[in-house]
């Protein structure tokens, strides 16, 4: 046994690594990627854009341009801020970091329905938070009573609600979500509405946030450009009231989004109709 392993956390050594299976010769459905490539004309235009990027420089003003473009794309509500992540995975990790109190006797908790996105639990574990998964009902419906009981018992720092759910595709009942959000608000917890699959959905919780901002003051809304059609560039974004997003953004590593990724995203946002047509298929 390598002696240096004694300094690697036991819980990390006990974990199984997240493995991406090779998909050569297979119809790959598990990752829900956009199967369409860009037209030759758009590929050429994107190539020209990327060729002009100053890759000798650290990311700068173009990151701000991207944030502004995304804010315009989602019609960011007044008083809200927006931050970028290297995929939603990084944003989930930053949320766990923000809520993990070093040396705390009572560990912060994370609650989410299961089956759900694996990174909720994995990021919680890696940051020393306790993860509580709440099983869905037999028909994959959200078990409101069980979720409410878990929230009452554990008072989690974070409650994740995927809208629609990954991997079951459920779009949870809005009244149920409102009640859970109100319950979490009573003790000061956070609710993260994960809208990774919003391009395939007929609804967005952002409309609810606009209509009832006070009731959603502790809600963060997270999205990714992966299901938009850009899984290869690894770009997620999260929006919330400015005071809240500013605290999470303090933990973001500098230059976490590359200039090439930012330019790809800006190009895509200039051609949203193309990606919307692909998602509709």
Listing of model-derived features with the role each one plays in the protein:
Residues 37-38, 168, 196, 200-201, ...:
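Short acidic/glycine-rich loop or secondary-structure boundary segments that cap or lie
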Residues 54-185, 192, 197-216:
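Conserved core of the PLP fold type I
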Residues 1-57, 155:
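N-terminal "arm"/small-domain region of PLP-dependent enzymes with the aminotransferase-like
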Residues 33, 165, 226:
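Glycine-rich beta-alpha junction loops
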Residues 14, 28, 84, 112, ...:
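Structural signal for conserved beta-strand scaffold positions within catalytic alpha/beta enzyme cores
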């Amino acid at each position: 046994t390598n002696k240096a392993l004694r300094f690697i956390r036991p819980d990390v050594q006990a974990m199984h690594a997240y493995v991406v299976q090779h998909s050569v010769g297979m119809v790959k459905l598990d990752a829900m990627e956009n199967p369409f490539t860009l037209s030759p004309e758009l590929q050429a235009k994107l190539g020209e854009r990327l060729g002009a990027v100053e890759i000798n420089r650290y990311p700068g003003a173009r990151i701000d341009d991207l944030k502004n473009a995304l804010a315009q794309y989602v019609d960011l509500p007044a008083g809200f801020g927006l931050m970028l992540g290297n995929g939603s995975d990084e944003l989930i990790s930053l949320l766990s970091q923000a809520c993990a109190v070093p040396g705390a006797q009572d560990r912060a908790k994370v609650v989410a329905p299961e089956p759900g996105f694996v990174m909720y639990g994995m990021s919680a574990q890696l940051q020393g938070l306790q993860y509580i998964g709440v099983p869905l009902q037999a028909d994959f419906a959200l078990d409101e009573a069980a979720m409410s009981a878990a929230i009452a018992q554990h008072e989690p720092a974070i409650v994740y609600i995927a809208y629609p759910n990954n991997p079951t595709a459920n779009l949870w009942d809005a009244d149920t979500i409102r009640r859970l959000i109100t319950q979490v608000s009573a003790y000061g917890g956070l609710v993260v509405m994960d809208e990774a699959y919003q391009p395939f959905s007929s609804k967005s919780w952002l409309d609810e946030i606009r209509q009832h901002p006070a009731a959603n003051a502790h809600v963060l809304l997270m999205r990714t450009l992966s299901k938009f059609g850009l899984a290869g560039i690894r770009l997620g974004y999260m929006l919330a009231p400015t005071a809240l997003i500013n605290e999470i953004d303090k933990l973001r590593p500098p230059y976490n989004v590359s200039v090439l990724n930012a330019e790809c995203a800006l190009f895509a946002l200039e051609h949203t109709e193309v990606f919307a047509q692909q998602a509709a298929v």
